Design a protein with these regions (language model features):
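Acidic donor-binding loop at a coil-to-helix junction in glycosyltransferase catalytic cores
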Residues: 182-189
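Acidic donor-binding segment of Leloir-type glycosyltransferases
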Residues: 30-71
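Conserved donor NDP-sugar-binding/catalytic core segment of glycosyltransferases
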Residues: 102, 106-136
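Active-site donor/metal-binding and catalytic loop motifs
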Residues: 196, 201-236
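Non-catalytic, C-terminal membrane-associated alpha-helical segments of glycosyltransferases
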Residues: 224-228, 239-296
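Glycine-rich, basic loop-to-helix element that forms the pyrophosphate-binding segment
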Residues: 72-89
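Short aromatic/hydrophobic "clamp" motif used to bind/position activated sugar donors
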Residues: 94
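A recurrent flexible, glycine/aromatic-enriched loop bordering the glycosyltransferase active site
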Residues: 147-166, 181-182
Length: 296
């Protein structure tokens, strides 16, 4: 009887936002893992207006018992699609995963289910050593991916939605800010968690981030993300290093100079960043300079 009540308590919805990525392999892997836990589960995908080819490829997942693919006709962005998934989920615990990931450990789901409670749990992520996405992989591996011990020092600032576990009741109370269409929506969600007094627990339960994004595309996405910070300087200052640097430049009246230096060096910066040996320091200046240019 105790075992049965525990199974009911641990009912899990695995939620995957989809945009132009075939996630059949990921879902089949998660499905096999979930069967081994013996807990009730569902896998729910929400397609954010992908191309026809990707939609057709992912529809095969509807044949799996407990798996649903929901398709939206217009693109809304990651914040909206995660809120939509949380609303559509049937079970009391939610596991959000990005489509370009793959669990590292075979006990991936079990580790999350051991941490069921009134908290958010972040498992982290890592990058394969080899890959052609030089800038994206280098930035991800050296800046974004951090061990749990490091993430615990600033748990809310280190929240990233690529791989996290949350009670549905808490998620629906906090939700993602849908005014962030793409970029820093994770940061805003971390702030909302802190404002609500919800604990964030960081553990070692990573996924591989199997990114396939050339540097030029990553720079376009970076610029879109940086634009999201305009008008949010005060709100996100404690959470975003770029804004703290910008604030320092403002104090020294150096924003216009930084914007000018960015504009005259932009092509040289992009030449380095799209090459095989991109400099992360130059990438940091690229983002800061672009934000300064937007601000003047």
């Amino acid at each position: 009887m105790l075992y049965l009540s525990r199974k009911i308590h641990n009912m899990l919805s695995i939620l995957i936002p989809v945009y132009n990525i075939n996630c059949v392999s990921l879902v089949r892997k998660l499905y096999e893992m979930a069967l081994l836990t013996e807990f009730p589960f569902e896998i729910l995908l929400a397609d954010d207006a992908s191309c026809r080819k990707v939609r057709e490829e992912n529809r095969v997942l509807n044949r799996l018992d407990g798996c649903r693919v929901l398709e939206l006709e217009t693109n809304h962005g990651p914040a909206f699609i995660r809120n939509y998934l949380g609303e559509q989920a049937r079970y009391p615990y939610l596991l959000f995963l990005d489509t370009d990931t793959s669990p590292v450990g075979e006990d991936f789901l079990s580790l999350y289910l051991k941490n069921v409670g009134g908290q958010v749990v972040c498992g982290g992520f890592c990058y394969p050593e080899e890959g052609d996405s030089f800038l994206r992989n280098k930035y991800g591996a050296q800046v974004e991916a951090q061990p749990a011990a490091e993430r615990r020092k600033h748990p809310y600032q280190h929240f990233i939605s690529m791989n996290f576990f949350i009670p549905r009741e808490l998620f629906l109370r906090v939700r993602f800010d849908e005014t962030f269409h793409l970029g820093y929506e994770d940061t805003a969600f971390g702030k909302r968690l802190e404002d609500a007094g919800i604990q964030v627990l960081h553990i070692e339960n990573p996924v591989w981030h199997l990114v396939e994004e050339d540097a030029a595309s990553f720079l376009v996405k970076t610029r879109r993300s940086v634009k999201n910070l305009l008008g949010r300087e005060r709100e996100l200052l404690p959470y975003v290093r770029l804004l703290r640097w910008y604030n320092s430049l403002k104090r020294f009246h150096a924003v216009a100079l930084t914007a000018f230096l960015f504009r005259i060096s932009e092509s040289l910066l992009e030449k380095n960043l799209t090459g095989k040996h991109p400099s992360l320091r130059l990438f940091a200046f690229y983002k800061l300079g672009y934000f300064c240019w937007l601000s003047v």
